[in-house]
């Protein structure tokens, strides 16, 4: 109720990203967050909104293990069982670009850290708060895929974005884009109450880590991709297509 949305009403649904990816594949949702990886399969029905990105600028999904970090983690991952948070997550895509020869085990994102600690898998690919808490459980960082991607390409790693169904039409798309941007700007300008709201969903990591984690992925990149951010999205999907992780190159349409 902080933003004037005119004649549009929004119903907020909270869900994990892989569930949203799967629902978007069925075009169930008019506006939703999705993984950039998933957008390769959604682009005909959905356009990418310019606001709402989660960008890993020198950081991102982390590969962790009970075993200490080897000298050459990329090579060491060959043949190992790695838990991933869903086949259409961008974390899974980045892992395939980093080391396609590992064996991936799909499980809910909030069970991966526990599985790695229990030795049920050789390594886990962590998204969300696990990126900050893995060492508390005695896990070792093998690779930060966002740091690797920046070193490899010079670009941030685009993890997620907001999309809107094309059949809503230009007028509604324009208004939704405006409302979304306004809501993000409002949250950044009123950080304390926004963090208090976010803390309700932080899975027990405490205020300091919540503040840090939110700052990692809700920032000026979230307000607008900008030229560099849009190029980063296109580059990631081009790379994925070129090595056969996604079926073909696509042109990403940004709106708003």
Spans of features found by a protein language model:
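Short beta-strand-centered segments that line the small-molecule binding cleft or hinge
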Residues: 20-32, 40-54, 135
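Conserved C-terminal helix/tail region of periplasmic/extracytoplasmic solute-binding proteins
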Residues: 239-256
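Secondary-structure end/capping motifs
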Residues: 169-239
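Pocket-lining segment of extracytoplasmic ligand-binding domains
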Residues: 108-200
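A short beta-strand-loop structural module common to alpha/beta enzyme folds
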Residues: 4-19
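Hydrophobic/proline-rich hinge and linker segments of small-molecule sensing/allosteric domains
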Residues: 48-72, 149-167
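Beta->alpha turn/N-cap motifs
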Residues: 16-18, 27-40, 108-109, 126-132
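Bilobed "Venus flytrap"/periplasmic-binding protein-like clamshell domains
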Residues: 1-2, 14, 61-123, 129, ...
